[in-house]
Curated annotation (Swiss-Prot):
Cross-referenced NCBIfam families: guaA_Cterm, guaA_Nterm, PRK00074.1
InterPro entries for this protein: Class_I_gatase-like (IPR029062), GATASE (IPR017926), GMP_synth_C (IPR001674), GMP_synth_GATase (IPR004739), GMP_synthase (IPR022955), GMPS_ATP_PPase_dom (IPR025777), NAD/GMP_synthase (IPR022310), Rossmann-like_a/b/a_fold (IPR014729)
Key words of the record: ATP-binding, Glutamine amidotransferase, GMP biosynthesis, Ligase, Nucleotide-binding, Purine biosynthesis
Name assigned to this protein: GMP synthase [glutamine-hydrolyzing]
Pathway(s): Purine metabolism; GMP biosynthesis; GMP from XMP (L-Gln route): step 1/1
GO cellular component: cytosol
Ranges that cross the membrane: none
UniProt domain Glutamine amidotransferase type-1: residue ranges: 9-199
Single annotated GO MF: ATP binding
Amino acid sequence: MTKNIHDQRILILDFGSQYTQLVARRIREIGVYCELWSWDVEEADIREFNPDGIILSGGPESVTEENSPRAPQYVFDSGVPVFGICYGMQTMAEQLGGKVATSTEREFGYAAVQVTGESALFADLETTQDVWMSHGDKVVEIPADFTKIAETDTCPYAAMANEEKKYYGVQFHPEVTHTKNGLKMLENFVLNACGCEGLWTSASIIEDAVARIKEQVGDDEVILGLSGGVDSSVVAMLAHRAIGDKLTCVFVDNGLLRLNEGEQVMEMFGDQFGLNIIKVDAEDRFLDALEGEAEPEAKRKIIGHVFVDIFDEESKKLKNAKWLAQGTIYPDVIESAASKTGKAHVIKSHHNVGGLPDDMEMGLVEPLRELFKDEVRKIGLELGLPYNMLYRHPFPGPGLGVRVLGEVKKEYCDLLRRADAIFIEELHAADLYHKVSQAFTVFLPVRSVGVMGDGRKYDWVVSLRAVETIDFMTAHWAHLPYDFLGKVSNRIINEVNGISRVVYDISGKPPATIEWE
């Protein structure tokens, strides 16, 4: 009998660390299902979830403060292995009888940890480990039934363990790539201490999702808004595998897409994969609605409202459609849940996080709501979607509507599309595209004097933007070679009639945002 991929599970309690979602992604990489919940979860919820192990994340608070977060007592009464990371180790130590003190100097950055004792956590690892530290407090006395298993020159208890209960604590962050063997430590905890197997694979996720879609919708028809982006594309492939022609995709070409994107979506999903697609050519409708509007937030709202209106109209034509499929992913669920309840553990509740009207009277099909973006891409590859589509740089929902600064006009969009296509084409040709995190072109609604042949011309300006980032929360501008930038600039000015000047944006985030609007 095939094992259910959700049967083995790890619970991660979030104490507010910027790395907490990264912990969850690492556990999934190991091949084990996990969920991320707020630290103040009710005991009954943990009992119902019935985890094979619990991880206490890092966090910005100080255990030495009176009202700082604590793990629920049931964590230590449940009988399952527990792994405390940074703040998680500190609250574990303090709650189980140890002592934590505020350090005179904050430890931040690389550190060499000396493994001082035998421990299942460090099985098959060297006695010296390069790790990433980020803490102010530190454990100064471990609980009576714990042993020290690692130290640094400035941190006497860099790791501790109660091997009998399978409780482990580390003062560093094993989830970040800076900790060289961090993934191995997490594997030792999840696979060895907790006894989990690697059931969570791309193939098994697809099999599970297809079965769940079939069970959920039965013989009913399903409608999906297909944008050509990663999430909706993967949902389309999963739903089509599950229910075939009972899926109808609605693709709205709003005139704000990249060069030839509409044709590419129809060719790939209609001609190549054989999906039922209704294409709505709505360029005029969107541009008419945007006429005269220059304020970015207002433009976003207009584009969103027009899309919803069109989708609503098309869905009403499909009398038998009882279900709406959406590309909601796990970070959307976490963010939406936290904003509504202050807690992140409502993965089971089916609330609409996609902005479509609540009166559509359809059930929601959200096969990606348990998945992180990197997992979505991996199952997309398994489903046969092309690498270059799945790993394409992020593109904003409003499309060129927020990359044309100020008022959006067809002329501006056409110029921007062609300039951006040249930039992206040259990035691929120079093998630079996948070395930057995001690259695009922005249309500036200002004219600049240029020289063409013997004459002068007075045409528009575009800006090239390329950034390097890990999490898109902060970003550095990409130091692209001057020769490369020169080539792109020359091509745009020579090939796109109407553009006389190309500039390169060298702003970091912060203070600037990645997108201009």
